Design a protein with these regions (language model features):
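Conserved, structured core segments of small domains
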Residues: 1-115
Length: 115
């Protein structure tokens, strides 16, 4: 099953946790050796974000995701694991679990060729 890892920055992380975090290169090696890494991207900073909504037929575009965000989506990864527990273990090894947080969600199959 595929899972999305929402990689979230967190302004409240501790310096000790960040210092103890594993290296990202080690995580990529670990995930790739097991065939669990599918793809991922790092997002540009919050000042490049726009929020788009349509309300009552009117387009509303605002700068940034939220005002004074303490947490933000910094990127995402797609992983493939046999169980949710395996996905949690893989996410635990990612340095962003130490420096921010990772939200895991199973990906709903849409029946496309890449599912």
């Amino acid at each position: 099953m595929r899972y999305v890892m929402f990689i979230c920055g967190d302004a409240d992380h501790s310096a000790d946790d960040a210092a103890a975090a594993p290296e990202i290169e080690d995580w990529f090696t670990y995930a790739n050796e097991r065939g669990q890494y599918v793809q991922g991207v790092r997002l540009q900073d919050l000042d490049q974000a726009r929020t788009v909504r349509v309300r009552d037929g009117e387009l509303l575009v605002t700068d940034g995701p939220y005002t004074e965000a303490r947490e933000w989506i910094a990127g995402f990864g797609i992983i493939e694991c046999d169980t949710f527990e395996e996905a949690v273990e893989l996410a635990r090894r990612n340095p962003m679990a130490w420096e921010g947080r990772i939200e895991l969600r199973p990906i709903h199959s849409m029946g496309g060729p890449n599912d």
